[in-house]
């Protein structure tokens, strides 16, 4: 199995290197990520860091104090993306049962929930599907959670939550 992974990894690296030449410009989010690109022209890759729209993702001046009778947890993302599906299932199946207090509620907010995500809905778990203003969801939450066990890169959802 290790041999197959090595062969496939090498094939993918060659493919990515060839594809690099088909584009006039290249961007990446960090200098460290750029160092991982095995191409002779990697120093020409433009670094464009992730960020959030501060006009939209800003703390509310009118947020009510936390309600001790109901604690609101939030996880956001495209709910058809495999790492988000995995995180949602992990939250509901592994973490929520550990929270013995019945006043803890979880909102899974995000577009296109797969059947596995929709099936997680319960009295304590709300699956929203698409929401018009995700910033409102962040403001309503007491705590944002992002138990991502798969995927790579800087998650904008974490930046959005920190800004809200």
Predicted regions and their residues:
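Acidic donor-binding loop of glycosyltransferase active sites
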Residues: 24, 139-156, 164
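Glycine-rich, N-terminal phosphate-binding loop of Rossmann-like dinucleotide-binding domains
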Residues: 30, 77, 148
């Amino acid at each position: 199995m290790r041999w197959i992974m090595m062969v496939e990894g090498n094939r993918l690296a060659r493919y990515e290197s060839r594809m690099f030449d088909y584009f006039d410009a290249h961007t990446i989010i960090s200098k460290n990520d750029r160092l991982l690109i095995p191409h002779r022209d990697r120093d020409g890759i433009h670094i464009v860091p992730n960020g959030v729209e501060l006009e939209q993702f800003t703390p509310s001046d009118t947020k009510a104090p936390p309600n001790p009778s109901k604690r609101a947890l939030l996880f956001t993302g495209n709910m058809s993306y495999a790492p988000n599906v995995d995180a949602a299932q992990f939250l509901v199946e592994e973490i929520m049962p550990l929270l013995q207090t019945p006043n803890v509620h979880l909102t899974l907010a995000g577009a296109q929930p797969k059947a596995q995500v929709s099936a997680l809905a319960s009295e304590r778990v709300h699956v929203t599907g698409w929401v018009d203003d995700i910033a409102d969801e962040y403001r309503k939450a007491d705590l944002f959670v992002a138990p991502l066990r798969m995927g790579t890169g800087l998650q904008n959802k974490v930046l959005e939550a920190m800004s809200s």
